[in-house]
């Protein structure tokens, strides 16, 4: 249980941020994603989840920045890139209707 209280664990910070995002508590979600990315700028899941959070508030440009970061990080295809790319495409498609 001590891992849950470790502010230096990027995985835990990402999971907490993800949980806040699912609860639509975006201020603490963004704070946790930022902390995770400060500790590990190459944290793929944090980039994916932060990109999805940006779409929740309608910030497509910021979401695409995280997609670009994933493209640089993932030397071979990775699920996080594919998932965020899919969510962005769906967002763009729904915005056109």
Question: Where are the predicted features?
Answer:
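Canonical tetratricopeptide repeat
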Residues: 15, 49, 83-87
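Register position in tetratricopeptide repeats
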Residues: 22, 56, 73, 87-94
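Structural marker of alpha-solenoid helical repeat scaffolds
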Residues: 5, 39, 72-76
């Amino acid at each position: 249980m001590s891992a849950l209280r470790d502010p230096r664990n990027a995985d835990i910070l990402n999971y907490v941020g993800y949980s806040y995002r699912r609860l639509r508590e975006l201020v603490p979600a963004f704070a946790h994603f930022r902390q995770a990315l400060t500790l590990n700028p190459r944290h793929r899941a944090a980039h994916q989840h932060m990109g999805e959070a940006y779409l929740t508030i309608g910030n497509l440009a910021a979401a695409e920045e995280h997609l670009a970061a994933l493209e640089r990080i993932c030397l071979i295809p990775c699920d996080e890139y594919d998932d965020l790319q899919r969510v962005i495409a769906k967002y763009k498609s729904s915005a056109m209707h």
